[in-house]
Curated annotation (Swiss-Prot):
Residues 1-28 are annotated as: Disordered. GO terms for molecular function: structural constituent of ribosome. SUPFAM superfamilies: L35p-like. It comes from the Bacteria. PANTHER family: 54S RIBOSOMAL PROTEIN BL35M, LARGE RIBOSOMAL SUBUNIT PROTEIN BL35M. InterPro entries: Ribosomal_bL35, Ribosomal_bL35-like, Ribosomal_bL35_CS, Ribosomal_bL35_sf. This is Large ribosomal subunit protein bL35. Keywords: Ribonucleoprotein, Ribosomal protein.
Length: 64
């Protein structure tokens, strides 16, 4: 039986925390930043957790 392969796009975008939650990077912080306020850009810098609704889909992509 072959090895189970992880989706490589998901592998690059998500990390597991020590408690088993899934971390993700915020979108909207790569370009077209001049119209966004400093506060908004600052809040986009921090990592966030994947929501409970999406967590099962992400776990399936990561095969965990």
């Amino acid at each position: 039986m072959p090895k189970v392969k992880t989706k490589s796009g998901a592998k690059k975008r998500f990390k597991l925390t020590g408690s088993g939650k899934i971390k993700r990077k915020s979108a909207y912080h790569s370009h077209i930043l001049t119209k966004k306020s400093t506060k908004r850009k600052r809040n986009l810098v921090h990592a966030h957790l994947v929501s409970a609704a999406d967590e099962s889909n992400v776990r399936a992509m990561l095969k965990i």
